[in-house]
């Protein structure tokens, strides 16, 4: 019996639209990561980028559970002395909701060059309008 090896030419990429309005941040990120990596496909292969494109709409309307809006803090450093900055999740959701979702999905993707390729297929938009209407089909409102 021969083992089937997936080739890059065998991979067919679909487009998935995820509506984040009223959904929990982690659930949206987990669903997006699953589609991006291709884990929903029977031909999933860890050493190839076999995932699909993912469009997340209504990023501004994503929710979080518990007291995370006040207690979860995102850290960054500019690299200069005194350049340490921290922001609460609630403030970031008001100013940069796209960053919050991209950061959550990035944490669920492998940290290597293939992960960078995978993350490039993620498209996040604040509202319902997106320029990928011709590629995408129906909207996934729940996982």
From Swiss-Prot:
InterPro entries: Ribosomal_uL13, Ribosomal_uL13_bac-type, Ribosomal_uL13_CS, Ribosomal_uL13_sf. PROSITE patterns: RIBOSOMAL_L13. One of its GO terms (molecular function) is mRNA binding. GO terms for cellular component: cytosolic large ribosomal subunit. The keyword Ribonucleoprotein applies. Keywords: Ribonucleoprotein, Ribosomal protein. GO terms for biological process: negative regulation of translation; translation. It comes from the Bacteria. Pfam families: Ribosomal_L13. The keyword rRNA-binding does not apply. HAMAP family: Ribosomal_uL13 (MF_01366). This protein is one of the early assembly proteins of the 50S ribosomal subunit, although it is not seen to bind rRNA by itself. It is important during the early stages of 50S assembly. PANTHER family: LARGE RIBOSOMAL SUBUNIT PROTEIN UL13M, RIBOSOMAL PROTEIN L13. Part of the 50S ribosomal subunit. Belongs to the universal ribosomal protein uL13 family. This is Large ribosomal subunit protein uL13. It comes from Dehalococcoides mccartyi (strain ATCC BAA-2266 / KCTC 15142 / 195) (Dehalococcoides ethenogenes (strain 195)).
